[in-house]
Structure formats: structure tokens, C-alpha cells
A protein has these predicted regions:
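A contiguous loop/helix-start segment that scaffolds small-molecule binding in enzyme catalytic cores
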Residues: 2-10, 14, 44-46, 54-168
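Short glycine-cluster motifs
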Residues: 1-53
Length: 168
């Protein structure tokens, strides 16, 4: 959610050389702060990174309720000031009121805050913690306690480095 493409286009137009240096996105920092894995077996294998429409619209097909219908893990940027509407759109898309959610304020900063809540309590939680901007909203059952263990470490699972054993 920046303007790097426009900046690179201008640099190219002006024949100014540049490098693009990769960084760690705040959505990864938020996962670390939450001590969470966004993809869990039989919970969610996809992560949707998006934002609410605000001063800048989003394409119609990327409306929050349509994306929420996938029931994937969602990481929502630039939407902290619209949490009542966000909750409504998430519920309209099929999440339940008690779906786990979190607000991560200033992920990876010294003054980081991590607030666990539900889809229904997003706005209330932000208000209680005086969070009005600079936060990510994470939604999905990846934040819950129910998941299946990965087959990767199951003794009967064969992969490149190990032949599975049959269980008795």
C-alpha cells in the first residue's frame, strides 16, 4: 500500500538507477507478535491481505464481505478507523461474531500492542486500548486453539527426507 511503482516509473523515466531492497512486511511482524501461524492444517491454507475501501476505493471484486466468504485468514491494513464497518462486512461475508481476531498496533516497534478479541469486539477492543491507526487487523480461526497437526512430522508420512513407517 504504497507508491513504489510510481516512484520507480519516474526514476526510469529520468534514467536514474536504483535498487529495490526487500524488507519484512508488518503482516509478518504481526504474526511474530501474535506467536501465530497464519496457515494451519484443516483451518486455513490461504492468507488474504487487503484493506477496507476508504478515500481510495478497492475493486468491487475485492470488497471485504466477498473476500471474507473464503473463510481464509485475513490480514487487513489501513482500516483501524473503520472497525465497526469492518466487523459488519466480515459478518456479512460469513465470519461468526466469535471468530477470533486480533489488533496488532505498530508491529515490531518498541511500543507494539497486541490485543486479542473477536470479530464482534474489534471496535470496542481498539477503543479500550486507544488504538486509532497504525494497526493491522488479523481475522480467522488460525488465532484459535483448534487445528490438526501437520502430516510432515507424522511417522507414517513419507517425504523427501524420510520413508514413513506403518503404525500398528
Amino acid at each position: 500500500y504504497g507508491a513504489i511503482r510510481e516512484q520507480m516509473d519516474q526514476l526510469d523515466k529520468d534514467n536514474i538507477p536504483y535498487d529495490v531492497v526487500p524488507g519484512v512486511s508488518s503482516f509478518c511482524g504481526a504474526a511474530a507478535a501474535l506467536k501465530a501461524e497464519y496457515t494451519l492444517p484443516n483451518v486455513s491454507q490461504s492468507v488474504i491481505i487487503t484493506r477496507m475501501a476508504g478515500k481510495t476505493p478497492v475493486p468491487e471484486k475485492e470488497e471485504i464481505a466477498l473476500l471474507a466468504a473464503h473463510q481464509a485468514t485475513m490480514v487487513i491494513f489501513l482500516s483501524t478507523g473503520m472497525l465497526e464497518q469492518l466487523s459488519q462486512r466480515l459478518l456479512a461475508g460469513g465470519y461468526q461474531t466469535d471468530t477470533p481476531a486480533a489488533i496488532v498496533y505498530k508491529a515490531t516497534w518498541n511500543d507494539e500492542k497486541v490485543c486479542h478479541c473477536t470479530v464482534a469486539t474489534l471496535a470496542q477492543t481498539a477503543k479500550e486500548h486507544n488504538i486509532t491507526k497504525t494497526a493491522l487487523i488479523i481475522v480467522g480461526n488460525c488465532l484459535g486453539n483448534e487445528y490438526d497437526r501437520s502430516l510432515l512430522y507424522h511417522p507414517s508420512f513419507t517425504h523427501e527426507f524420510r520413508k514413513g513407517t506403518s503404525e500398528s
